[in-house]
Amino acid sequence: MDKLADLNYTLSVITSMNDTLHSIIEDPGMAYFTYIASVLTVLFTLHKASIPTMKIALKTSKCSYKVLKYCIVTIINTFLKLAGYKEQVTTKDEIEQQMDRIVKEMRRQLEMIDKLTTREIEQVELLKRIHDNLITRTVDVIDMSKEFNQKNIKTLDEWESGKNPYEPSEVTASM
């Protein structure tokens, strides 16, 4: 690991890259030289910049691991987007957050189902009581003395002048 930050090691890597690039240039049929050179340059820069940064970040704080992890995931997702892929790499923390959100939603729905089930049970009990109250019971003798309509009944003989007071009479109107 100490070789990564060493100047001589860096120069030897640059020299080997230059030798590789010069051998590619000598081939006249090489049409993708600029693309290969830019990719190699980016990879070398990432290699040289990320290793010492990771060392320093890991030594200074404990949360730097998460920061580096998110940086690496972002870089990988960028490469995937450049390559045309729609899929993305996710970290374990993001998956855990999504799982927590799903579990919360499931708990909320279970509580709602529990409340609805309790209400339905109460409604069934209420309907049973109403049904029990509506069931007709057979009675042998009906006592009509307690009926309101039966107290003031008069027969035709008991009416004054023997005439039904509820029958309409003829009315003469002047014009």
From Swiss-Prot:
GO terms for cellular component: extracellular region; host caveola; host cell rough endoplasmic reticulum membrane; membrane. The chain crosses the membrane at residues 29-51. It comes from the Viruses. InterPro entries: Rotavirus_NSP4. Plays an essential role in the virus replication cycle by acting as a viroporin. Creates a pore in the host endoplasmic reticulum and as a consequence releases Ca(2+) in the cytoplasm of infected cell. In turn, high levels of cytoplasmic calcium trigger membrane trafficking and transport of viral ER-associated proteins to viroplasms, sites of viral genome replication and immature particle assembly. Homotetramer. Interacts with the immature particle in the viroplasm. Interacts with host CAV1, early and late in infection. Interacts with host integrin ITGA1/ITGB1 heterodimer. Interacts with host integrin ITGA2/ITGB1 heterodimer. Interaction with microtubules blocks trafficking to the Golgi apparatus. This is Non-structural glycoprotein 4. It comes from Rotavirus A (strain RVA/Human/Venezuela/M37/1982/G1P2A[6]) (RV-A).
